[in-house]
């Protein structure tokens, strides 16, 4: 067993132990589809006034939710914009070296400044404690609403930027944020480019086939086809054939399994790194290099 596989397996085992009986979807596996969830989200952006944190109130099928976004760097309308979606249980507004924050590690905590506007979106249920987050994820409809709300917020941000700028916009995200990225493309496809990191379109398989299934409830594992019907969105993604996807997967990822999720990207320039899920998320050089290459590919 190589180190990449080891750390993924260890992470899943510890996560399952901490979750105990409160595993994903242990209360309910009933949920509208992603498309139904996205269509139902109602939200308005606050007035944008430069860099800072912008709280948003979203009306959804599961009630009012609390997404937000941070304009971390604004260089001007003559620059491209990167909209980033964080991973599971990250704290994307916590700009400290000790924080669980891939956005900060890739774009902020570096000597290599990026010539782009930087916006990071905070998904619903990520402005609370781990315990509160776990409670919310007992219900599958909360999980799908969380992703759908980030998708809708991403679209609102793009429309706002387009009012003043014709420069490229890249929608991107890692793990949880990668699913948001791909779902946005499938439904809206309004971003110039998409850079999903360690994600695909077969989201149901994460909970049913990968090592991460340790985090799934018995009720989910006993209802495979229902989970697949709700969470896999490969057919939605396939509706788009524009060559604007620049994915990255980790070869040894035990959660976002390469053999499964790479099927999402047939015909697209898939970048592969020699990592697992955990080791890939902390390989900030490889991730940053990928973003730089995407900027080059779209001509900044």
Each model region followed by its residue ranges:
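C-terminal catalytic histidine-bearing segment of alpha/beta-hydrolase fold enzymes
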Residues: 266-300
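Alpha/beta-hydrolase active-site loop
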Residues: 132-164
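Primarily recognizes the serine-hydrolase "nucleophile elbow" in alpha/beta-hydrolase
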Residues: 158-212
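The feature captures the conserved acid-bearing segment of alpha/beta-hydrolase catalytic domains
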Residues: 206-267, 271
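Short, surface-exposed "cap/lid" segments of acyl-processing enzymes
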Residues: 62-129
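Short, flexible, mixed-charge acidic loops at enzyme active sites
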Residues: 128-137, 209-212
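N-terminal targeting or regulatory segments adjacent to alpha/beta-hydrolase or S9 domains
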Residues: 1-54
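Long amphipathic N-terminal alpha/beta scaffold segment
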Residues: 36-78
């Amino acid at each position: 067993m190589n180190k990449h596989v080891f750390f993924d397996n260890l992470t899943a085992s510890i996560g399952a132990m901490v979750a105990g009986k409160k595993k994903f979807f242990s209360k309910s596996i009933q949920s509208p589809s992603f498309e139904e969830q996205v269509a139902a989200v109602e939200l308005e952006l606050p007035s944008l006034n430069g860099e800072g944190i912008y709280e948003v109130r979203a009306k959804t099928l599961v009630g009012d939710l609390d997404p937000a976004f941070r304009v971390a760097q604004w260089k001007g309308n003559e620059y491209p914009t990167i909209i980033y979606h964080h991973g599971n249980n990250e704290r994307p507004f916590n700009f400290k070296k000790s924080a669980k924050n891939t956005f900060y590690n890739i774009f902020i905590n570096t000597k290599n400044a990026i010539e782009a506007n930087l916006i990071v979106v905070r998904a619903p249920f990520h402005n609370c404690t781990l315990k509160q987050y776990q409670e919310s994820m007992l219900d599958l409809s909360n999980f799908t609403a969380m992703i759908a709300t980030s998708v809708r917020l991403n679209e609102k941000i793009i429309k706002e930027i387009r009012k003043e700028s014709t420069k490229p916009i890249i929608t991107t995200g890692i793990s949880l944020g990668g699913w948001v990225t791909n779902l946005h493309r499938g439904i809206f496809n309004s971003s110039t480019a998409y850079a999903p990191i360690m994600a695909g379109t077969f989201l149901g398989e994460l909970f049913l086939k990968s090592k991460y299934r340790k985090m799934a409830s018995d009720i989910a594992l006993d209802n495979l086809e229902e989970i697949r019907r709700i969470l896999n969105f490969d057919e939605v993604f396939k509706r788009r054939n524009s060559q604007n996807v620049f994915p990255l997967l980790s070869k040894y990822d035990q959660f976002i399994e390469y053999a499964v999720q790479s099927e999402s990207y047939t015909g697209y320039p898939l970048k592969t790194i020699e990592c697992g899920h955990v080791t890939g998320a902390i390989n900030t050089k490889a991730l940053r290099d990928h973003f730089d290459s995407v900027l080059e590919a779209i001509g900044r």
